[in-house]
Amino acid sequence: MGWACSYKLLPDGSRQIISFPIPGDIVGLRSILLRIADHSFSALTDATINPIEGTHIVKCMTEFPRLGAALMWATSRDEAMVVEHLVNIGRRNALERTAHFFMELAERLSLVGLAKETEFTCPLSQYVIADALGLTAIHVNRVLRQLREQKLLTIRKGKVHIHDLNKLRKLAGFQGGYLNSRD
């Protein structure tokens, strides 16, 4: 349990957060094949992390094809999330981008039983959210105020409360099928 992020540091010292792994996610799979890590991971709160040797994963995938299929599904889901994040940063305005971020987080946490559909714990600071969304912390603060004033979403004491799920979903243009399309 706990909160972490994957990120890439830029030459000027700034950071772009790429993702927030949640319990059950497998991180760093690409580095098994590429044999190089092109980004880093950091715990944001106390977190439990279970390391697995890459050679062990490859061996298990050979011996247990269903595990290989599950890892392929997880990798495909992660790729779909990166596509959504690229669209967020490239084409959605700050309000839509922030709404999408919280909709995706709510959906992901709900899928693993860590959230109700409209309420979840979120210890992320506005600085961390800003690094994930390609915004400044000041801009994130303004957008969160807009969401609160529109009675769509509030954050209090590390808890996110979504007040109007349908309106927030519509604002975000959120279609969460890419997160849970496994049958």
Go through the PLM ranges and name each one:
Residues M1-Y7, I22-G24:
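Glycine- and acidic-residue-biased ligand/ion/polar-headgroup-sensing regions
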Residues T45, P65-G134:
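Polybasic "coupling" helices that flank or enter modular domains
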Residues A4-Q16:
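A short beta-strand-loop-beta hairpin characteristic of the jelly-roll/cupin
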